Amino acid sequence: MSKKTKVSMAVIRRLPRYHRYLEELLKNDVKRISSRELSEKMGVTASQIRQDLNNFGGFGQQGYGYNVEELYNNLTKILGLDKTYNTIIIGAGNLGQAIANYTSFEKSGFNLKGIFDINPRLFGLKIRDVEVMDIETVEDFIARNKIDIGILCIPKDNAQYTADRLVRAGIKAIWNFSPIDLKVPDDVILENVHLSDSLFTVSYRLNEEELFKKLKGETAKIDG
């Protein structure tokens, strides 16, 4: 289980997309945008956008649309991006290092405080001035540095055990890149990320037309 939300996850997953696009509009000095224009860019209906935003009070004006800066600022607060969060990465392999090197997270308020691994050869390695440390010290580090989010980038065999350790140490949110769906207490926020899911979606779309041609042919044979 994981901490339940008051708004559907489908809505929550669309909010970062709205926020990202509004940021681009601001950079291009766009002052306002209609629901229709926003829907064309987002690939969802104008009605859906209005429903999504109405969960938080609604921000548009009839006949005017949305003030881009105002909506962006409101979404920043809704997403909690007006605050800062202390994070750690568990696993200093290729994926862990890639996430550590992604500077946009820090710009959004996610401050990387430590990286942990089981491999002694990696201890002392610095990634953007953040040192790789022994995983056996993680509980003390979490307590001393008031860590909010643990980012798991380790093989699935150790993922649940490690997640349990983080939870016992006081972590309240886990961003999990390990290829396994973790289980955590109800008061802990968990986001399981399977990178292959997105790639498999691409492969499906590449094969969709061929798939339905075959299905249509098989249906025709049955009907015949």
Swiss-Prot record:
Assembly behavior: Homodimer.
UniProt-listed NCBIfam families: PRK05472.1-3, PRK05472.1-4, PRK05472.2-2, PRK05472.2-3, PRK05472.2-4, PRK05472.2-5
Gene Ontology MF terms: DNA binding; DNA-binding transcription factor activity
A Gene Ontology BP annotation from the UniProt entry: negative regulation of DNA-templated transcription
Cited SUPFAM superfamilies: NAD(P)-binding Rossmann-fold domains (SSF51735), Winged helix' DNA-binding domain (SSF46785)
Annotated DNA-binding residue span(s): 17-56
InterPro entries named in the record: CoA-bd (IPR003781), NAD(P)-bd_dom_sf (IPR036291), Rex_DNA-bd_C_dom (IPR009718), Tscrpt_rep_Rex (IPR022876), WH-like_DNA-bd_sf (IPR036388), WH_DNA-bd_sf (IPR036390)
Species of origin: Thermoanaerobacter pseudethanolicus (strain ATCC 33223 / 39E) (Clostridium thermohydrosulfuricum)
SMART domains in alphabetical order: CoA_binding
Similarity comment: family membership: Belongs to the transcriptional regulatory Rex family.
Record's subcellular location: Cytoplasm
Top-level taxon: Bacteria
Amino acids binding NAD(+): G91, A92, G93, N94, L95, G96
Function, in words: Modulates transcription in response to changes in cellular NADH/NAD(+) redox state.
UniProt keyword Repressor present: yes
Name of the protein this chain belongs to: Redox-sensing transcriptional repressor Rex
Classification via Pfam families: CoA_binding (PF02629), Put_DNA-bind_N (PF06971)
Keywords, sorted A to Z: Cytoplasm, DNA-binding, NAD, Repressor, Transcription, Transcription regulation
Coiled coil (UniProt feature): none
A GO-annotated cellular component: cytoplasm
Chief localization: cytoplasm
